[in-house]
């Protein structure tokens, strides 16, 4: 998506002069180097340092603080967001967002049912084991019962000196 950015400038007036902003990925890279993540930027945790970094990347290295104080943070952030939206490619109206499953916590009911009901292990075993132990136990059980094929083993040989 970021490779299809347009090179359009967003212009706004500040203190009698016209400022031209163009969205640039280097601003985000510089912010990440300073410990400010992309998600923090668009969640609203905007600080003066973030705005100044955007202005520096936009070609205003000498006076970002003056622009920030002249306009105010919220107003400047509105202009920066407009510049980002102007640069992003237009979304295809035929593509519809399909709500996916919440990638939150794992569904432990299914896993507990697999371990406790199918493998007939006590519930204490399930809750006291790590995920790795549970997967290893399930694989051993499935191979023994014939649900899975036994993985093929490969042996590596040192071919040096065998000639």
Language-model features, listed with the residues they occupy:
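Charged interaction scaffolds used for protein-protein
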Residues: 1-163
